[in-house]
Amino acid sequence: MKKIIIVGGGLAGSLTAIYLARRGHDVHVFEKRGDPFLVHSDYIDKVSLRAIGVSMTIRGIKAVLNAGIPKEELDLCGLPISGMSFYVGGKFRTRDLSPLESLSPLSLSRSDFQQLLNKYAVKNKVHYHYGQRCLDVDLDNKSLIVKNNEGEITEHKADLLIGADGVHSCVRQAMQHDCRRFEYQQFFFKHGYKTLVIADASEVMLRKDLIYFFGMDSGGLFAGRAATIPDGSTSFAVCLPYQGDISLQTRNALTMKKFFDQYYSMLPETTRAQLLSQFLDKPSNDLINVRSSCYHYKQHALILGDAAHATAPFLGQGMNMALEDAYLLDTLFDKFKNDIGQLLPEFTRIRKAEADAMQDMAIANYDVLSSSNPVFFMRAKYTRYMSKKFPANYPPDMAEKLYFTSMAYSELRDIQKKQNVWYKLGRVN
């Protein structure tokens, strides 16, 4: 049995902890936020401000179920997703997706899902240390220094350190300093976002089984998303630039009222008023893309989830890939018979290529959703028609594969590229 310290007790960190604890390891999770089971903890408050309604696709579901979490309990955290709808020119264009497996994607309550993971982590004897902010990581000594809410500073050592501490990862920063030829790339998207919540979804009059997208008729001004979760609330993510007459910095109520009246005209006036009030009151959040050339350091440390490969949420795969990271790590323990020296480099080799592919697709999707693209729907319709008419020759529907399978991201990116070629040929013909 090894002592393993995981920095970060979010979704990726908690699922990883479950997998490792099931193998008999002594797992300790250090989390800067409070206990998610405490209603008034800072964890819940911060998540409610930043979470863009989380969509769990089949790859994420399989990663959770393989950790021994019952499907019926996971289902209680979300609502089944059967398709997506785009609001353009005052009308909805709805696309139902055809299930390819017995499982269905879920629109999750992030806080409920976090509590579910913590529940099973504790059942598997994972030790959580809340209110512990990581100050420094010593990779060669496999130790970290943390500071609790009372200001007490302590040092903790382990046999393996895992960084699941998000986009501003302490563990990754230590790797940047200590890893020879470590390459790190970061850029901010021109848009940030605010999360607005309507407590009673019945007011909104949107289908609970659809994910909604807004802004494709805005000429690149903004991109929006909406989804309903089991508690009956609907979460709206409004992504806008940081500068301009209409932006995340706009404080003119009349200007933003016109914005919501134009692009959310299908909502009741009282609902639009609630969105406006929240928009003017809530802080904005950044969208950032992170690429790391290596995910491990010697036999001492590993990074996964957003710490390794954060990106914009416009493909809906950030959380799903993070959960799949935990599952892959578990399979590598079997493949290499617990040999850390072999499995950590293999994790980097496999996951780096897949993360790059996922990020490439997310960035491409962001460009489509945040820019004026009048041929988007024509192209989507053409793709579905061709894949059904000529299944042996034309690439399959990428959206259905993305939501309903665990197909490798690198394969999905190849499908996307082939569809681009076929579409160009179709236009020429």
Can you annotate each of these PLM segments?
Residues 9-18, 22, 163, 196, ...:
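Conserved mid-domain beta->alpha element of the FAD-binding
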Residues 21, 57-197:
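Conserved N-terminal helical subregion
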Residues 141-284, 291, 296:
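Conserved FAD-binding catalytic core of PHBH/FMO-like flavoproteins
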Residues 21-49:
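Glycine-rich FAD pyrophosphate-binding loop
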Residues 12, 16, 35, 168:
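Conserved Rossmann-like nucleotide-cofactor binding loop
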Residues 1-4, 22-23:
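Extreme N-terminal leader/targeting segments of oxidoreductases
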Residues 2, 270-273, 331-429:
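C-terminal helical "tail/cap" subdomain of flavin- and related membrane-associated enzymes
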